[in-house]
């Protein structure tokens, strides 16, 4: 019996070392001890500013959008998507979460942000013009190395062209499906790094 216990303990130690080795090799937390942490557990929530909406999203819990995840606000044009995103940003700042706002429509101004309760000081907020889909995604990936909880707001996906759209002409068929493929790959690539960094991506889209 004592030998069995010793052998079992050795295996646990070896696997503990393996977790460290894997995480070091891949440069991020990919292997976990579920007795210590659950990587799929939501670390926190950012309220939307509407307790009624929060309770619907979270099945009765007054929460909001999940930290470390990718969320989307979709709706028709001029239905208040940007204002809701701004309200979420203001709530995020209350939790000491930095806000990065990607604007593809050049429609956001400081007065609008202040009305929603956002602190636009550069120590708390950064405004970036969304030139192309690829540039936005590359910048998000770069921000993830900042060791800072960040809320990324992308306003909006629909109005952000791809690199090929920007460089090409005005033929809508020239790059059919390129944006969808790029976003699909990017979201797969960003899902785990966002969760590990406790950063949140809120995408706005038009129906």
Residue ranges and their predicted role:
Residues 120-130:
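Conserved P-loop NTPase mechanochemical-coupling segment
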Residues 137-152, 190-191:
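Short amphipathic alpha-helices and their capping/turn segments at secondary-structure boundaries
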């Amino acid at each position: 019996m004592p030998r069995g216990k010793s052998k079992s303990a050795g295996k646990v130690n070896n696997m503990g070392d393996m977790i460290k080795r894997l995480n070091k090799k891949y440069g991020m937390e990919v292997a976990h001890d579920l007795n210590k942490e659950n990587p799929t557990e939501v670390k926190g929530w950012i309220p939307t500013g509407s307790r009624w909406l929060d309770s619907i999203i979270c099945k009765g819990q007054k929460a909001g959008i999940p930290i470390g995840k990718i969320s989307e606000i979709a709706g028709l044009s001029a239905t208040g998507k940007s204002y809701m995103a701004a309200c979420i940003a203001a709530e995020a700042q209350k939790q000491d979460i930095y806000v990065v706002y990607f604007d593809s429509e050049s429609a956001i101004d400081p007065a609008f942000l202040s009305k929603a309760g956002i602190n636009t000081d550069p120590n708390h907020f950064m405004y970036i013009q969304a030139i192309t889909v690829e540039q936005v995604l590359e910048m998000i990936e770069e921000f993830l190395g900042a060791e800072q909880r960040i809320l990324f707001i992308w306003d909006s996906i629909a109005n952000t062209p791809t690199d090929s759209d920007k460089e090409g002409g005005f033929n809508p068929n020239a790059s059919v499906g390129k944006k969808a493929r790029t976003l699909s790959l990017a979201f797969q690539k960003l899902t785990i790094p966002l969760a590990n960094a406790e950063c949140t991506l809120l995408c706005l889209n038009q129906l």
